[in-house]
């Protein structure tokens, strides 16, 4: 490690250096991607129209400056995901936990990301959104439905093999403002 890298590490440790990262927000339509980004930017809930084309904005959380891309979740928009996700430092995948009828479609969509060799070590944060709604399934049920229990790497930020992808699920409610902060703290450890 050269002096420049050491200096940046020291400043980052002290919270005086801002890292930059590109984060892509994906998931099926109506999962809460745009609502979450609006909440992070404006600290207020707003009614958000379905995303028709990719949008980008910059956010600062802690010592990290995020360039975010909100990609639509409808079937046609998903065809554009690959050109964004392959250049990202991290992926936030939102799942509507109150709509288990779409779990299979969401699982297949997530599996396409997991199978993409360009993303083999890209951290993926899965936010199981809308857990506050009565019809929401438990996080454990969602994880089992997606068949990813063996891929989860733990919430503690444990040491991973260099070829291992950080992957974890956090329950949240974007509207009620809970759960996603823990997920972003976890993700920031891998950026």
From Swiss-Prot:
Cell location: Endoplasmic reticulum membrane; Golgi apparatus, Golgi stack membrane; Cytoplasm, Cytosol
Q: Where is this region: Mediates recruitment to ER membranes?
A: 10-14
Q: Which InterPro entries match?
A: P-loop_NTPase, Small_GTP-bd, Small_GTPase_ARF/SAR, Small_GTPase_SAR1
Positions that bind GTP: 30, 32-35, 129-130, 132, 174-175
Q: Which residues bind Mg(2+)?
A: 29, 70
For this UniProt record, the keywords arranged alphabetically read as follows:
Cytoplasm, Endoplasmic reticulum, ER-Golgi transport, Golgi apparatus, GTP-binding, Hydrolase, Magnesium, Membrane, Metal-binding, Nucleotide-binding, Protein transport, Transport
Acetylation among keywords: no
Q: Which GO terms describe its biological process?
A: intracellular protein transport; vesicle-mediated transport
Q: Where does this protein chiefly localize? A: endoplasmic reticulum
Membrane topology term reads: Peripheral membrane protein
Does the keyword Amino-acid biosynthesis feature in the UniProt annotation? no
Q: What is its EC number?
A: 3.6.5.2
Molecular-function annotations in GO: GTP binding; GTPase activity; metal ion binding
Quote the Pfam families the UniProt record gives: Arf
Query: What does the entry list as the binding residues for GDP?
Result: 30-35, 129-130, 132, 174-175
Q: Which Gene Ontology cellular-component terms appear in the entry? A: cytosol; endoplasmic reticulum membrane; Golgi cisterna membrane
How would you summarize its activity regulation?
Small GTPases activation is mediated by guanine exchange factors (GEF), while inactivation through hydrolysis of the bound GTP is stimulated by GTPase activating proteins (GAP).
**Which chemical reaction does it catalyze?**
GTP + H2O = GDP + phosphate + H(+)
The UniProt entry, under CDD domains, shows: Sar1
Function text: Small GTPase that cycles between an active GTP-bound and an inactive GDP-bound state and mainly functions in vesicle-mediated endoplasmic reticulum (ER) to Golgi transport. The active GTP-bound form inserts into the endoplasmic reticulum membrane where it recruits the remainder of the coat protein complex II/COPII. The coat protein complex II assembling and polymerizing on endoplasmic reticulum membrane is responsible for both the sorting of cargos and the deformation and budding of membranes into vesicles destined to the Golgi.
Assigned protein family: Belongs to the small GTPase superfamily. SAR1 family.
What quaternary arrangement does the UniProt entry report? Homodimer; upon association with membrane. Part of the coat protein complex II/COPII, composed of SEC23/24 and SEC13/31 heterodimers, that it helps recruit and assemble on endoplasmic reticulum (ER) membranes at ER exit sites.
How is this protein named in the record?
A: Small COPII coat GTPase SAR1
The gene behind this protein is SAR1
């Amino acid at each position: 490690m050269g002096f420049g890298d050491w200096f940046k590490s020291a400043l980052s440790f002290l919270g005086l250096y801002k890292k930059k990262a590109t984060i892509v927000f994906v998931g099926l339509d109506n999962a809460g991607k745009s609502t979450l980004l609006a909440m992070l930017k404006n600290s207020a809930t707003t009614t958000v129209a379905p995303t028709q084309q990719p949008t980008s904005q910059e956010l600062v959380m802690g010592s990290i400056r995020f360039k975010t891309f909100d990609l639509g979740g409808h079937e046609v928009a998903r065809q554009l995901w690959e050109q964004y996700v392959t250049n990202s430092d991290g992926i936030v995948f939102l799942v509507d936990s109150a709509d288990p009828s779409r779990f299979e479609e969401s699982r297949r969509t997530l599996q396409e990301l997991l199978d993409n060799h360009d993303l083999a070590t890209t951290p993926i944060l899965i936010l199981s959104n809308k857990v506050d709604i009565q019809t929401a399934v438990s996080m454990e049920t969602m994880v089992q439905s997606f068949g990813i229990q063996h891929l989860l790497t733990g919430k503690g930020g444990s040491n991973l093999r260099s070829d291992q992808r950080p992957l974890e699920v956090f329950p949240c409610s974007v509207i009620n403002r809970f759960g996603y902060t823990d997920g972003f703290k976890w993700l920031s450890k891998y950026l």
